Each structure stands twice: as structure tokens, then as C-alpha cells.
Amino acid sequence: MKVRNSLRALKKIPGAQIVRRRGRTFVINKNNPRMKARQG
């Protein structure tokens, strides 16, 4: 999982989902699990 300032590029990748957990924003991608990130 990467920690990024901006998730804008990651959320455009096919299969990406934006999830809010415990006040943090995550991008999870079941199609391409390498594209996981958290907004730092």
C-alpha cells in the first residue's frame, strides 16, 4: 500500500474504489491489487 498526497490519478484506474475508513481515504482495486493507496 502506498501513502499518497493525492488519489486523483489512482481513482481513474479501472476497478478502483474509494473507501473512507476511520477518517482516512483509501483506494482499493480488486482488479489490480498493486494500486492500493491511502491518502496521507
UniProtKB/Swiss-Prot annotation:
Keywords: Ribonucleoprotein, Ribosomal protein. Belongs to the bacterial ribosomal protein bL36 family. The gene is rpmJ1. This is Large ribosomal subunit protein bL36A. It comes from Paenarthrobacter aurescens (strain TC1). It holds the Pfam family Ribosomal_L36. GO terms for cellular component: ribonucleoprotein complex; ribosome. One of its GO terms (biological process) is translation. The keyword Ribonucleoprotein applies. NCBIfam families: PRK00831.1.
